[in-house]
Amino acid sequence: MASLKSIIRQGKQTRSDLKQLRKSGKVPAVVYGYGTKNVSVKVDEVEFIKVIREVGRNGVIELGVGSKTIKVMVADYQFDPLKNQITHIDFLAINMSEERTVEVPVQLVGEAVGAKEGGVVEQPLFNLEVTATPDNIPEAIEVDITELNINDSLTVADVKVTGDFKIENDSAESVVTVVAPTEEPTEEEIEAMEGEQQTEEPEVVGESKEDEEKTEE
């Protein structure tokens, strides 16, 4: 569990105020949820990024708010890709004994046997819905694909649960599969297809010879 300091924002702030705030390296944020009233705060962007890298997207953070320390999770955040800047954060105060359902990323581990033979690894499911208390939510769920051959697949039912959490997805939902490579045409086949295209004469649209003779009469 990582710690992060915040400073309470007093009064109503204009767009210009928020723009200057972000320009100074701070991110406007709000804290709400279990055992607390809504509080507007600001946090240092660099420090926030460090904390998220340490605990993960669903990690628990000890957020200093005034004289209090509140256990929070990041409920949501906004990011401006043009400015490469976090523009707002929602911190959710949590009850550590209350279960929550969140999305956890799937991390493929190993190299599939089928991939070594030319197969292509496809991953239709990148996140799993997980229910657990905040301290038991995994940062990622590893799925070992080492033994997968071409045309093999793994479903949610095949995912090994190594912690105190429950996966909510349909057990039959596909997580990863190894498909056969797409066969590309050989040079001979390409030449044959080009030859067929060249021998095909375009259909001429116009008067027939018979029509021309009638016209001359």
Curated annotation (Swiss-Prot):
Here the segments flagged for biased composition (Basic and acidic residues) are 206-217
Asked whether the UniProt record includes RNA-binding among its keywords, one would answer yes
> In which residue ranges is the amino acid composition biased (Acidic residues)?
184-205
Instruction: Please give the Gene Ontology molecular function terms for this protein.
Output: 5S rRNA binding; structural constituent of ribosome
Q: Which UniProt keywords apply?
A: Ribonucleoprotein, Ribosomal protein, RNA-binding, rRNA-binding
Q: Name one GO biological process term.
A: translation
Which stretches of sequence are listed as region Disordered?
178-217
Q: Which purpose does this protein serve, as stated in its record?
A: This is one of the proteins that binds to the 5S RNA in the ribosome where it forms part of the central protuberance.
NCBIfam families linked to this entry: bL25_bact_ctc (TIGR00731), PRK05618.2-4 (NF004133), PRK05618.2-5 (NF004134)
Q: How does it assemble?
A: Part of the 50S ribosomal subunit; part of the 5S rRNA/L5/L18/L25 subcomplex. Contacts the 5S rRNA. Binds to the 5S rRNA independently of L5 and L18.
Question: What is the name listed in the Swiss-Prot or TrEMBL entry for this protein?
Answer: Large ribosomal subunit protein bL25
State the gene name recorded for this protein.
rplY
